[in-house]
Amino acid sequence: MDSWIFAILPLLIGWLLDLLLGDPIWLPHPVVWFGKAIAACEHKLNRGNFRKAKGAFVAIVLIALVFALSWFLRRLLLPLPSYLLLLFDAIIIFYCLAGTTLIREVREVFLALDRSLDEGRQQVARIVGRDTSELSAQEVRTAALETLAENLSDGVIAPLFWLAILGTPGMLAYKMVNTLDSMIGYKTERYKAFGCWAAHIDDIANYIPARLTALLMILATGKLGRLRFVWKNGRNHASPNSGYPEAALAGILNCRFGGPHYYFGQLFDKPYIGENDRLLTTADMKKAVRVNRTAEVIMVILVLLRSIL
């Protein structure tokens, strides 16, 4: 098999599998195992003194273990028939991409909201960390679209970025970074010490991908003038990264994101992204999905070119 074909096939196979299947509930997923490992460490170590140091130790060790284990497995496969390594990498890529599942979940939020506000609240609670019990219909739509933008970075662009930089071990290690942040990277009383290093590492790992995501979203619309809106409003977020893809989508849809939210019973007064507080519709969701898919295709092409050059 020509080397350039071998270089691009794992990504093509893994990406196409994600497009076709998403994350089937019947298929075991590494992120579930990551979550169990994080939960076990947090339960055992997030108590007493030195919580910040213990949290840093847990984050660094788990990330390093995932990288080392996947690197070692690839080394074991090198002397064997080449298709085995190709399949291994393709499966890792498939597991690390979450674009299709995210889009399905956001569509389900809008469908549920058409049935009732309560169903919409319950559905959006599956994909956001905030308290959804008292959200209005507009706030449910806003939360879903914010998550669609933010997780284009976390679930697609950032994994592909780290694939291009460090191969499948780096891609899988990034998923551990992201899972750590999603589970313990909160500024609540329980997690603010133990999870602070998980949050810092996630901020570093997503610094370039988040901004790249915003750029790709704007490129997907062909209206580069909106970049000024992104750079102005991307900083209006508690996260140093999440605001950029959210600002890109707010600029594309000419709407307003952000604002105060409840997380784990605590009110977080987040700034607004954008100024046009207009009614969001299913048409906006469909447009956002098209933007996500186009940005994803551009990124896949860039990584494919990187792999053969």
Regions found by a protein language model. Name each.
Residues 1-172, 185-309:
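Hydrophobic alpha-helical transmembrane segments
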Residues 175:
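Pseudouridine synthase
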Residues 178:
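Substrate/ligand-engaging "lid" and interaction regions
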Residues 182:
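Glycine-rich phosphate/dinucleotide-binding loop and adjoining beta-alpha-beta core of small-molecule
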